[in-house]
């Protein structure tokens, strides 16, 4: 489901996914660089990621873009220090699977979404949804719904 990721600093596919995600907690971050709510949420998300790392509970957040084009997507993911899901079909599949997309994408994906951007889908070690972080609706307090102590959320264990 997640392979390959794109290293936004090079634009190339990142192939060694299992090793990269080993012993980390993983979330899909549905976002867009043009979205004011997303850009205001991101400093807290980055601080959360760093605090998790510092506490010995590393987190990997994967960028799922609602940006206007591939270049904007790669640039934004790189600025956040995140690996990216390849722009296009893979991001579309994830948006449909988890029912999360930007309002401007409703004509493409429909109106039956559970959330817009920003939002995170926390995955368990089997790539199944473990938790939903509804940042669009709840803002910064939404990060409290991510239980970093749940062993199901640690990949490669």
Residue positions per predicted region:
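Loop/turn elements at helix/coil->beta-strand transitions in domains of secreted/extracellular proteins
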Residues: 23-25, 57-60, 81-82
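Conserved redox-active cysteine motifs that mediate thiol-disulfide chemistry
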Residues: 30-47
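Conserved beta-strand elements of beta-rich interaction domains across eukaryotes
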Residues: 32-35, 66-69, 125-128, 137
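Thiol-/selenol-based redox modules, centered on thioredoxin-like
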Residues: 115-157
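A short beta-strand-turn-helix
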Residues: 2-26, 54
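Structural microenvironment flanking redox-active thiols in thiol-disulfide oxidoreductases
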Residues: 42-78, 94
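Thioredoxin-like thiol-disulfide oxidoreductase module
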Residues: 66-117, 121-122, 126
